[in-house]
UniProtKB/Swiss-Prot annotation:
Disulfide bonds: none annotated. This is Bifunctional glutamine synthetase adenylyltransferase/adenylyl-removing enzyme. HAMAP family: GlnE. GO terms for cellular component: cytosol. Residues 476-988 are annotated as: Adenylyl transferase. One of its GO terms (biological process) is regulation of glutamine family amino acid metabolic process. The lineage of its organism: Bacteria, Pseudomonadati, Pseudomonadota, Alphaproteobacteria, Hyphomicrobiales. It catalyses: [glutamine synthetase]-O(4)-(5'-adenylyl)-L-tyrosine + phosphate = [glutamine synthetase]-L-tyrosine + ADP; [glutamine synthetase]-L-tyrosine + ATP = [glutamine synthetase]-O(4)-(5'-adenylyl)-L-tyrosine + diphosphate.
Amino acid sequence: MTKRETVERRLSEVPPGVIRPYTQTELKSVFSTLKDIGKAEPAVAALLAGESPLKDFIAAAFTLSPYLRDMAAADEGLLTLAISKPLEPLLTDLVRDARDCWKPAEDAVPVENEVMSRLRIAKRRLSFVAALADLARIFTARDTTRWLSEMADASLSAAIDHLLLSAHESGKLKLKNLAAPSEGSGLIVLGMGKLGARELNYSSDIDAVVFFEPSAGIIDDPYDATENFGRMMRRLVRIMQERTADGYVFRTDLRLRPDPGSTPLAIPVEAALLYYEGRGQNWERAAYIKARPVAGDIKAGENFLRELTPFIFRKYLDYAAIADIHSIKRQIHAHKGHGAIAVKGHNVKLGRGGIREIEFFAQTQQLIAGGRMPPLRVRATEDALAALTEAKWIDAETRDSLTEAYWFLREVEHRIQMVRDEQTHVLPDTEAELKRIAFMLGFEDTKAFSEKLEEVLRLVERRYSALFEQETKLSGEAGNLVFTGQKDDPDTLKTLSTLGFQRPEDISRVIRTWHNGRYRATQSVEARERLTELTPDLLRAFGESKRADEALLRFDNFLSGLPAGIQLFSLLGNNPALLSLLVTIMSSAPRLAEIIAARPHVFDGMLDPALMSDVPTRDYLAHRMGNFLSNARHYEDILDRLRIFAAEQRFLIGVRLLTGAIRGEVAARAFTHLADLVIEAALNAVLSEMEAAHGPYPGGRVAVMGMGKLGSFELTAGSDVDLILLYDYDDTAQESTGAKPLDVVRYFTRVTQRLIAALSAPTAEGVLYEVDMRLRPSGNKGPVATRISAFEKYQREEAWTWEHMALSRARLICGDASLMEDARSIIASILSQKRDVAKVSTDVLDMRSLIEQEKPPENNWDFKLINGGLIDLEFIAQYLALIGPVKGLGAHEPGRNTAEALQALAAPVMESQAFDDCMAAMGLYTEISQIVRLCIDGAFNPKEAPAGLIDLVCRAGDCPDIPTLEGEVKRLSKAVRKAFVAVVKNGG
C-alpha cells in the first residue's frame, strides 16, 4: 500500500477544472440525465443542488464518456456509491464481492447464472468508480491498472472455484478442500501479458493459459482430465465474456497456449514442458516474462513457472535470439519510417513510439540477460526499466523518460477506451472526437495534446529503434498431415471429402507434388517440414471456402512460382488471419490470385500486421514510396522500383477492399492517390533524364492533368489513366540548353512520349498503367503535348460540349506549381461561363443516346453502360456543372468525385426521393464495381463468377443473395434513368 493510500481518498477531492465538458449541448443533456437519477438518489440530488468541483467534474466526465453516462443511468445507485464512499475501501469491497461470489450460501451452491451476474455487477461498478477516480486525477494510471488487474484475478479465481465445485458436486472430480476448491487441485491458470504484470488497460481483454497436473489426483483418468478441464475452460470463457443484461466481465483469450490450433484448452503440465523445451519459440519466451499464476492452484502454478525458468531466461547471453524477437515486433507493428507522426488515427499501443515499443525495449533486454541476472526477471514494465537501470543496462535518464512516456501513453489508452468501453488503442481520426480525448486528459485543446503526444512518441521511437538493426524470418507451429508414397491413402481421401473437396484424388496428388520437392518453394527439407505442419490448417481453411478444389489449385499455381517457401509456410502457420486472407483471394479473386502467382513479391505486404488498420491515404503511400525509391541508382532502377511499388500497393489496397477493411469509395481514392504519386515520380524521373541528355528548356514548365476517373478520384484496381500533358516555355528561347539541344516541339513531345513509355511500357516488372491521352485537345489528331496557351484557346473556341463535361472532372496532379495554378484558373474560368442551357441539354442527351447505340451493356451488371447506370449519374453531375453558373449552383471544385458533385449540384435541383435514389445507386455501383474490377477481368456474370466473388458482391450490395441484389439494381437504375431524364431533359 502506498503512502497516499493510507489516507482515504474520495471523489469529492477532485481539483476544480481537472477536465472540461465536451460541448455545452452535451452538458445540458447530461444535467437532464443527472436530474433523472437524482429523483431516486438523494445524494445525487444534493450534489446537483449545490455548486462544487465534484458536480462540475461528474457532469464534464459524462459529456466526455457516453459509456460512463449510460452506466450511471442504467444503475442509478452507482453514482451515489461512487460519490459517497472512500475509493479504496469501496473498490476492495467490490473485488471481494467478485472473489466470493462462488461461495455456497446456506449450503446451496450458486447457479452459474448467479455467479455470472454477480461478477458482472462487481466489474461494472469497479470500472465506473476507477474511471471517475482516474479522470479526476485522484488515481494515477498505475492505480487504475492495478485495480482492474485485481478484479480480473478475483473474477478468474471465483469462476475457477465455481467450476471446480460444480464438477465436484456432479461427481466428475473429487476436491481436496471444498472451502478452497482450487487448493491442491493441480489446475493452473496463468495470467499472461498485462494481466500477468498487473497492468490491465481500461477495456482490456485478458490472456490466460491453462495447464493441469494429473498427479494432483482429483481426476483419476488422465484422458478424462483433459476432456473435463477442456469443457470447464469453455465454460470459463462463457462466464467471463458472454454478454448478458448485466454486461460482461472480461473478454478472455486462451490462445497463448502451445500450438492453439491443435491442442485442448487445458494442457497437461508435462506435455507443456516438453513442448517448450523442444519447440518453444522466442515469442513464447517473451510472453512468459510477464506470466503469473492468477487463479486455480497458485502453488502448482508457481512450481510450473519455476520449471519453465530455464526456457524463459537462458543462462548465456542470448544475443542470437534478438533477430527472432525482432520478428515478433514485426508481427505487431508496421514500420512507418521517420516521417511525421499523424496523431489522428495513431495506434498508441502498436504504432510508432507506442506502448508496445516500450514493453519490447524492456523485454528484449530481459531475455538477453535475465538468465545471468535474476533481478531482471520482473513482470511489470516500470519494474523492468528500473531493474535494467540497476543492472547498468540502461541509464537513469532513459529509465525515467521511458517510464514517464509509458504511463502517459497508458493514460491516453485509458481515455480512448473509456469513451465507449471499446478494446481499441487507436486515436480518433476526426478533430471533434480527438477533442474528447484531449479534454479527458486535461489539455486545453487538441493542439496542446497533439504536441505532447508527438513528443512522447518520438522519444520512444528514438530509444527503441536503436535496439533493432536486422530482421530474420518468422517461425511457426501448426498441426501435421503427411502425404507419402505414390498411391493415395484411403483415409486421407475420406478426410479431404469431409473437409469439402469434391475431387480428393486430384487434391491428394497436388499435395504429394508439394512434398516431393518439385517446386522451388519446397525443395529444402525445412520448407517441406514447415509445409507438412501447415497442411492440416491449409486444407481446413480451403475446405471451408466455396469451390474448395478450384481455390486450392489457384494456391498451387501460386506456390509453383514462389522462389522459396520457408518464410511463407511459417507465417501462414503462425497467422490464421493471413491464411484466411490468402484463401479468400484464391477462392474469390482470380485476378488477384494471378497477380501474386506472377509476382509473389506483392504478397510480402500482406505480412504487415497493421495492413487492415492503416488507411492508405496519400501521406501513407507517399511515405512508403519515398522509402522504397530512396536507394534507386538510376532512371531504369527508379522505374522498376515504381512498378514493384505500384503493383504491391494496388494489391494491398485490393486486399483491404476484399476483406471489408475499407469501402469502395475509400479504395477508389487510394487507387487514385497511388496513381498520382507514381505519375509524379515518373514525371520527375523523365524530366531529370531529359535535362541530363538535352538540358533544361529555358522557362520550361510541365504539368500533368488527370482526366476521367483519375481526375475524380474514382480509379479501380484495373483502371487505365487519362492524362493531358501541358507545358509552357520562354518565347525567346529557340531550343534547350544541353549538349544535344532540341527545339520546343520535339523537346516537350519527347517528354510526353517518355512519360507514356515509363508508365505503360511492358517490362519484367510489369506495367504501371495503361495511358489514354485521347482527351487532349483535338484528341488523337492533336499533338501529344499541349502548350497552356493552346489548351486555353482550344477550350474557349473549339471544344465540344462533351469536352467541357470531361473538363469538369479534370484535376492537376503533378508538375510545376505555377503552371498547375495557371491551368486551374483556366479550367475554373471556362467552367464558370454561362452557357445556353437548352443546347447543353440537347448535346448531353444526344451523347447519351449515341453511347447506348454504339456501346450497349453486356448484361444487367454492366453498371457503367446500363440505362440508369454510372454514365447517367456522371452525366447528371457534369451537365449540372456546365449549367451551374446559369442556375446559381455554386463554383466548380476540382477533385470532387461523382457522389460529391451530385451532393453539391444535384441536391438543390432534384426531388429528395430522386436524389436519395441517385446517391444510393452511386454507392451501390461504386462498391460492387470496385470489388468486381479487383477480382476478375471482364464483365461480372453471376452464372460464371467464382462462388467467393458472389458472396463478396452480395456483401458489397448489402443483400443476402443475387436475386435480391439484382432486384435492387433494377429498382435503382430505373430511378436514376428517370432522374436523368427529369434533370437533363428539363434543363435542370
